Amino acid sequence: MKGKFIVIEGIDGCGKTTQIDELSKWLPSSGLIKKGSKLITTREPGGSHLGKRLRGLILDNNQNNKPSPLAELLLYSADRAEHVYKIISPALNNNDWVISDRFSDSTLAYQGYGRNINLEIIKNIESIVCQGESPDLTFFLEISPEESIFRRKNQIPDRIESEGIEFLEKVNKGFKIIAKEKNWTVISASQNIKTISNQIKETVLNNFSKNT
């Protein structure tokens, strides 16, 4: 029996990191994770050793090092292939739980809807890269592009975060389309941290309490 795979998606600034931290603190005492199983939190890009190096290439804010849209897509895909092979699949096959900050649908949103790369090309690449792995539960933390920019105003942005609001609007629209198609759990990220966390916990319990 495989472990459970939870993914949290959303545009930058939506609070994914905070909510993954909240969820990872609660899950071990929730009664959902069987004795002997572990909880692993990870992220994309950068979840593996190779991924950390690729993350530096992907997010480098030096415009002289900016990759083409296709090269960017393939770098993300290389990161994910390694992430699945080295981290996600071994954990799930060991009956461990995995929570990931982003997975393959971020590529559809950012490189597909954001960069206008053909969605079928991305889906074909991802079908190879993901090696059959897909989330058991995906959350979409929804905020407006304007709120995203406001929340990050005092941060030093990486290359993707430096893109203008038009790009962010396209990405956000993509996430909304994907969320509807795949029946994700959509949560307003404009609420306070505790309210969002409680909604995530309730959904996790409802989805997994009968299966553990």
UniProtKB/Swiss-Prot annotation:
E.C. designation(s): 2.7.4.9
Reactions it catalyzes: dTMP + ATP = dTDP + ADP
Q: Which biological process annotations from GO are given for this protein?
A: dTDP biosynthetic process; dTTP biosynthetic process; dUDP biosynthetic process
For the keyword Transferase, the answer is yes
Q: Does the keyword Ion transport apply?
A: no
- List GO terms (cellular component aspect): cytosol
Keyword set for this entry?
A: ATP-binding, Kinase, Nucleotide biosynthesis, Nucleotide-binding, Transferase
User: Do you know which InterPro entries this protein is assigned to?
Assistant: P-loop_NTPase (IPR027417), Thymidylate_kin-like_dom (IPR039430), Thymidylate_kin_CS (IPR018095), Thymidylate_kinase (IPR018094)
Question: Which residues does the annotation say bind ATP?
Answer: G10, I11, D12, G13, C14, G15, K16, T17
Molecular-function GO terms, alphabetical = ATP binding; dTMP kinase activity
What's this protein's family per the entry? Belongs to the thymidylate kinase family.
Task: Tell me what this protein is called.
Answer: Thymidylate kinase
Q: Which organism is it from?
A: Prochlorococcus marinus (strain MIT 9215)
Question: What lineage does UniProt assign to this protein's organism?
Answer: Bacteria, Bacillati, Cyanobacteriota, Cyanophyceae, Synechococcales
